[in-house]
Amino acid sequence: MMRQLFVLLSLSILLSGSHINIKKEYFSTLNTQNSSAVIEMRYFGSNNFLGRQVQGYKAPICYLSNEATSALKKVEIALKKEQLRLVIFDCYRPQRAVDDFVLWAKKLNDTKMKDIYYPQVQKKDLFKEGYIAAKSGHSRGSTIDLSISTLDMGTPFDYFDPRSHTMSPKVTPAQLKNRLYLKKVMEDNGFKNYPKEWWHYTLKNEPFPKKYFDFVIE
């Protein structure tokens, strides 16, 4: 209890100062020097459902809480034994990026990426169907979107469709097997899956379950 109070007090002090200190103290970065994963930060570029760079992404950097980073390295070790590696699509996500998603979703005439990312869903229904929300676990720093390189998961990342549900019966047996393999290796190392997105995992014992950060990725 005393340790938790100390951490919360320290965090509140940091929040009143520089976001740089928060990153250094509580977050780590994954890169080619310390990770075997392919870092493919989709929201830094235009290969995403908005079709453009998202607010808050000024660099293609993967930030995760120190605890999530440690757990993910165990996943990498397990996959390396099978000559496999992760592909990472998104990590920590600033709250301003989530706000950007919300504003985009309200612009019903902007549908240039519909055929790729949400062909079966009307844009006006993205909130109702739960594909867009005002808050995201990614902003807490211990959620990651990923896949396994070379394995077919049945849908692209961020595909707004029931086929993206982890246990969807609409994918092939081989694709479901790949999803379950990813699920097992992630769960074995402390993560839990969001059932509506095969790529979405959160550290079970995340250090900041109620805190939504907003420092820019740079």
In which residue ranges do the predicted regions lie?
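Extracytoplasmic cell-surface/polysaccharide-interacting catalytic and binding patches
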Residues: 17-91, 95-196, 205-218
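Conserved metal-phosphate-binding beta-hairpin within the catalytic cores
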Residues: 201
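Sec-dependent N-terminal signal peptides
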Residues: 4-14
